[in-house]
């Protein structure tokens, strides 16, 4: 494990105005990244953002830092994170930068990088950037300063790319879909993709104002989507998170379909078509029901650490093409290089159309075991998981489950949260046991 000062599991993230998400730091980050990336030849960086109000400030700071290092910035405006990975590849840019805090509230923001291949930066490159950050900022000669430009057709390019992952012999004609874009980066992309493929689209969360991103909408809160699907008598609902790398769905009965179920549907369809090479990667948080359902299909399944970068690492290690987190990060390496909510959703839609089945029936081969996740916020630098009382509470729960469930306690990689997950056969028992551990974590925090 590398010991980064600034880079977390998903780039650099925090509250805007607090270190490190300040204009002066982000300017220097742009300069430091520019110094490292300039060693590799190309002088162009693609920069995209989600819809947070702070994105304007931070992209200006990045531009100044990159220019001082002699690199040019090409801006896309609000675009999904996976779109920047795609555009970085197609423009042969040295790197892509996304200004986003994904599913976090609007007052947070972050910076994450993509390599020339459209994948997250290797640890050694992040370490090299951190080493440059420790040095005093310098500026290249005026004749070598970087320039700024805008990619005017970025959205159109990405829309066509997404549509190209949907089978050319199929159409969404006759399907009514409610789409919730979380007032985030997919708001002007996802509805167009679905309409151009033939669907009737009802939109939610497509009016960003800079401060309503992820606010009681999108993949992290599907209650509004569930009620709208029922009210519209729609065939299904699709929700993305603020930066578009996650997808959660809702069937025609208003029931939530999470990342585990989406992974199951896609894997089963790949298997049916003879296109599943190897197995499937989930995480420690993946529901036991997914593992059991894949076992019935004869599909190998392994778990990685939580975090889409670790899912990808495990996929690359095994040589497999499909992986996902239950939160809705779905990685399909035969389609793209990173988690992409729009593209993952399209693969589920193609399974629906190709099998003449609704989403509810497609998911029926997998039974989710009751799983309760409780997030406990903590303050300070101490680790509540090191507490003897927390360990005792966890051991007590393990004993009560008696081998017929799972307990997982972990720190969030992006927020000051302890995630308490308990899984078992009985919903009431699982909820009670999860809150028993959560109470111990709160007391320790």
Curated annotation (Swiss-Prot):
Record has Phosphoprotein as a keyword: yes
**Record's keyword terms, sorted:** Isomerase, Magnesium, Metal-binding, Phosphoprotein
For this chain's record, the cofactor binding note is: Binds 1 Mg(2+) ion per subunit.
- Under the GO molecular function aspect, what terms does this record hold? magnesium ion binding; phosphoglucosamine mutase activity; phosphomannomutase activity
One GO cellular component assignment for this chain's record is:
cytosol
Which co-factors does it depend on?
Mg(2+)
> Which reactions appear under catalytic activity for this entry?
alpha-D-glucosamine 1-phosphate = D-glucosamine 6-phosphate
Q: Please give the residue positions where the record annotates the modification Phosphoserine.
A: 102
Positions with a binding annotation for Mg(2+) = 102, 241, 243, 245
Q: Name one GO biological process term.
A: UDP-N-acetylglucosamine biosynthetic process
Enzyme class of the recorded protein, top EC level: isomerase
- The EC code for this enzyme is 5.4.2.10
- In what way is this protein post-translationally modified? Activated by phosphorylation.
Would you say which domain of life the source belongs to? Bacteria
- UniProt entry tagged with the keyword Magnesium: yes
Report the active site residues.
102
What is the recorded function of this protein according to its Swiss-Prot or TrEMBL entry? Answer: Catalyzes the conversion of glucosamine-6-phosphate to glucosamine-1-phosphate.
Fetch the PANTHER family from UniProt.
PHOSPHOGLUCOMUTASE (ALPHA-D-GLUCOSE-1,6-BISPHOSPHATE-DEPENDENT), PHOSPHOHEXOSE MUTASE
Q: Which family does it belong to?
A: Belongs to the phosphohexose mutase family.
Q: Know the name of this protein?
A: Phosphoglucosamine mutase
Q: Which organism is it from?
A: Sodalis glossinidius (strain morsitans)
Instruction: Output the lineage of the source organism.
Output: Bacteria, Pseudomonadati, Pseudomonadota, Gammaproteobacteria, Enterobacterales
Q: Which gene encodes it?
A: glmM
């Amino acid at each position: 494990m590398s010991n980064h000062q600034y880079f977390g599991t998903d780039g650099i993230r925090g509250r805007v105005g607090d270190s490190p998400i300040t204009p002066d730091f982000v300017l220097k980050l742009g300069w430091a990244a520019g110094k490292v990336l300039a060693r590799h030849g190309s002088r162009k960086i693609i920069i995209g953002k989600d819809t947070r109000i702070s994105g304007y400030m931070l992209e200006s700071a990045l531009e100044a830092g990159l220019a001082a290092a002699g690199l040019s910035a090409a801006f896309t405006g609000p675009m999904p994170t996976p779109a920047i990975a795609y555009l970085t590849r197609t423009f042969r840019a040295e790197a892509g930068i996304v200004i986003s805090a994904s599913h976090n509230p609007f007052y947070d923001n972050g910076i994450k990088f993509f390599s020339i291949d459209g994948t997250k930066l290797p640890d050694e490159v992040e370490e090299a950037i951190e080493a440059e950050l420790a040095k005093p900022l310098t500026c290249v000669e005026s004749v070598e300063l970087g320039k700024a430009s805008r990619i005017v057709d970025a959205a159109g390019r990405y829309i066509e790319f997404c549509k190209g992952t949907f089978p050319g012999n199929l159409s969404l004609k006759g399907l009514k879909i409610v789409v919730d874009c979380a007032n985030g980066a997919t708001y002007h992309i996802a509805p167009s993709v679905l309409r151009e493929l033939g669907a009737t689209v009802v939109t939610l969360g497509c009016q960003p104002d800079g401060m309503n991103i992820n606010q009681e909408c999108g993949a992290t809160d599907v209650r509004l989507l569930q009620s709208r699907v029922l009210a519209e008598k729609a065939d299904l609902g699709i929700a993305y998170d603020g930066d578009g790398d996650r997808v959660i769905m809702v069937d025609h009965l208003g029931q939530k379909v999470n990342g585990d179920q989406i992974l199951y549907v896609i894997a089963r369809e790949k298997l049916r078509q003879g296109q599943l090479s190897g197995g499937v990667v989930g995480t420690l948080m993946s529901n036991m029901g997914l593992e059991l359902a894949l076992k019935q299909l004869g599909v190998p399944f392994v778990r990685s650490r939580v975090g889409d970068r670790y899912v990808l690492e495990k996929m690359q290690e095994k040589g497999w093409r499909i992986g996902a987190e239950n939160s809705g990060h779905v990685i399909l390496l035969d389609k793209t290089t990173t988690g992409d909510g729009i593209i993952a959703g399209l693969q589920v839609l193609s399974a629906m159309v190709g099998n003449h089945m609704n989403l509810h029936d497609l998911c029926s081969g997998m039974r989710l075991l009751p799983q309760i996740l409780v997030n406990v916020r903590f303050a300070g630098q101490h680790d509540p998981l090191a507490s003897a009382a927390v360990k005792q509470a966890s051991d007590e729960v393990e004993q009560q489950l008696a081998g017929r469930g799972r307990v997982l306690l972990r720190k969030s990689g992006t927020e000051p949260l302890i995630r308490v997950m308990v899984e078992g056969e009985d919903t009431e028992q699982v909820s009670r046991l999860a809150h028993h551990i959560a109470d111990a974590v709160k007391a320790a925090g």
